[in-house]
Each structure stands twice: as C-alpha cells, then as structure tokens.
Amino acid sequence: MRRLLDAWSGIPAYVRNGRFDVVAANKLAMALAPLYQPGRNLVRDMFLDPAVRVVFPDWPEIAAQTVAALRASTDSRNAELAASLNGSDEFRRLWALHDVRPARDETKRFLHPYAGMLVLRRQSLAVAGSDLVIIAYQPEPGSPSADSLADLA
C-alpha cells in the first residue's frame, strides 16, 4: 500500500484502520493536515487537538459525522476509544445523539496556512480482507483548489 500512496503524489491519501488510526499517509496528506500523520487517531484528534478545528472550517458538521462513523464501526476497540473521549463536552454531546452512519464520500473544505482554502472530494476504498480503508482527496480539475494543491505538492 505504501507504493500506491507514494504513486499518488499529486493527491493527498492516507490509510486508516477500523479504530480510525492513521497507519500510512503520503507526503501530500501530511502536508494538508496534521491529523493525517501515521500514528494519529482521527477521532481523538478531532476533539482533542485544537489545530484540527482550524483545518476544517466546517468542524461542527465534520465532528458530528466522525462520531456517527465511530458508532457505525464494528471494531470492538472503539468503545474504549469513545470512553477515553468523555472529557470532551462536544464529544459527549454528539455521542448522546446516538447518530449512526458510516463515513461517506463527500466534499470537504480544508483551510491550509499556506495554500489557503481547498475544496476537495473525499474518495474511500476498502481494502479487502482487512479493516483498512484508503482515503484520497481530489480537487475539481482546473479549480483554484487544484492549483493550490499542486503548489502544496
């Protein structure tokens, strides 16, 4: 999978497991957002890393989607992850809603300190026989986001 991620040098891409841990990422994904570093946990960082709120201008919606995806996950370790986040008022509030829906491919806005606002389409690919998912973000061809992403690469 490492070679695949590296071959996609023009689009940010990373791999996460069923516990929402980032297990691999290409350079552009790591440049796009701090939470796409291998070893980071996407759910934990969504609520405990203040820098993530800056990266996602639509943080309230993305946080709600993240909690709903955590509830939809079948990984038994996620109950422990949810319990570890009870110190976050926002997480507790969203968890109490009992919204359950898997992560979906959609357009997300990223605010990068050098590249500015990037509008990217999320695409996910499940890795057969594992709990791994490859996530890639693509700009609309010819858009300002495509130009900014190319500069970031």
Regions found by a protein language model. Give the residues of each.
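Hydrophobic protein-protein interaction segments
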Residues: R2-A153
